Amino acid sequence: GVTFASPMEEMDADLLLRQADQAMYQAKLAGKNRYCVFDAEQDRSVRGLHETLEEIRRALLTQQFVLYYQPKVNMRTGAVIGVEALLRWQHPEKGWLLPAAFLPLIEAHPLAVEVGEWVLGNALAQMSQWHAEGLHIAVSVNVGARQLQQRGFVERLAELLAAHPTLAPGDLDLEVMETRALQQLASVSAINMACREIGVSFALDDF
């Protein structure tokens, strides 16, 4: 692993050693008899991603995420036939963030499952509240590829539904995003069937 001391920056020996270690690790990943020069830009990018992941963890713990419900309207009759749950992040410094600003960063990270469960749990809680008020509204929820392919997804979904016994499972529609990231279509087909068996509608969003 190779690194260089920049005359423009104040750098101590410990920092140089850490940078050389990072470069050595990258060289080992590339194969035998390789060397790698420390990339400061890549390092900043990695640290930026790590900081964002920590912010998302904090957002889950401090209720910074919010769901909005967009009506789905029958164009013929004008009647509202359901709503779609839309995730927003009320960031304390950056303001309201759309999913495109943060969800792609966690597609391959376990946080994708945690955020997905938060969305499902809160959507079901809202459905229960509406049901108690006499409103029976079907809700569509987007599910990411990683969450869908997580072991025990259907069992966990059944647990979340069981926590809201007044709801009809058929009022929950799952729309699977990132279908290009689905790795095993046979297992996805089995999940589809299992969801339908417990009464939950299931659709592949861009398949």
Where are these regions (language model features)?
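Catalytic core regions of nucleotide second-messenger enzymes
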Residues: E9-M11, K28, G95, H131-I137, ...
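Catalytic-site/binding-pocket detector for metal-dependent nucleotidyl cyclases
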Residues: P110-L111
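Regular, well-ordered alpha-helical segments
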Residues: Q22-Y25, L29, R58, S128-A132, ...
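Conserved catalytic/binding loops enriched for acidic/polar residues
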Residues: V119
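Active-site core of bacterial EAL-family cyclic-dinucleotide phosphodiesterase domains
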Residues: V37, G48-L105, N142-A145, G170, ...
